[in-house]
Amino acid sequence: MVVVKKAIPIIQAYEFLDMEIIQTPLMGRSVEQQVVGQATRDGDGVKLTRVLTQTHQRRLDPFLMLDHFGSDNPNDYGGGFPDHPHRGFETVTYMISGRMRHKDSAGNEGLLQNGGVQWMTAGRGVVHSEMPEQEEGLMEGFQLWLNLPSHQKMCKPAYLDIQSDRIPETWPHESVKVRVIAGESNSTLGAVHRSPSLFPTQTLYLDIHFQKQSSFEQALNPKHNAFLFVYRGSVSVVSEKETTAIELNRMAILRNEGNGVLIRGSPGAKVLLISGQALNEPIAQYGPFVMNTREELMQAVDDFRAGLFKS
């Protein structure tokens, strides 16, 4: 039985994703590498784990970074992320638990709460803050940095505030729930689905919950880079070659050799599955600026110092 939770459309006049239809049988990808994140602090002392670092940017193009923050100690998150700039990419913040307010120089404001997503396109430049609206309790979530193609890096900044009840959920069977943040799973379109002619990365972003020990299959475009991150319990990735166990708080990079992935989850396991089309463009990064050349980075710094991100 397939149960689908309908979502209110949040992006109008976009084409459906031009994804390749995966034929059966599914050829599951195997695990190329497992990665343990780096503990660090960012913003005003927020404790987090940097799961996807610059080391893996080229391999996991178009994805630039994935941070996982999670603590019930206010000292670990109370300072939040005061005003800071971005140019040339998108940030996707997914809140598992807690309350955080977003404000930016384009005049956008939103409250990110349990299960919600904020999808911000920095484009030509934006200054924003992300500050906790709680003084105690658990705050947990993820922030993904998604690169923009060269022709979109100087686009107008944009912002989507997606509440939890606007994210479609599908149950491939009674033991597995999938929250479809972006892309498509089990014939269910995600909260974000955009024209590939404008946004060629064709991002897939799933949050998969295993209620019992069970399996889940997801079609993947054979041309796309893909990885998963286990944030509860443990899972195994099953392919014709091998079965690989992925423990808690590990990222698994999937080989580009199949048209899907088969995941077996332990009871209560939760995993993010993310994939996208590589841009195959030069990556030049200086902190919160991601462009294609050093000259463009220098211009970004000059523009920020000149106050041009404020408009």
Question: Where do the model's predicted regions map?
Answer:
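Jelly-roll (double-stranded beta-helix
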Residues: 2-311
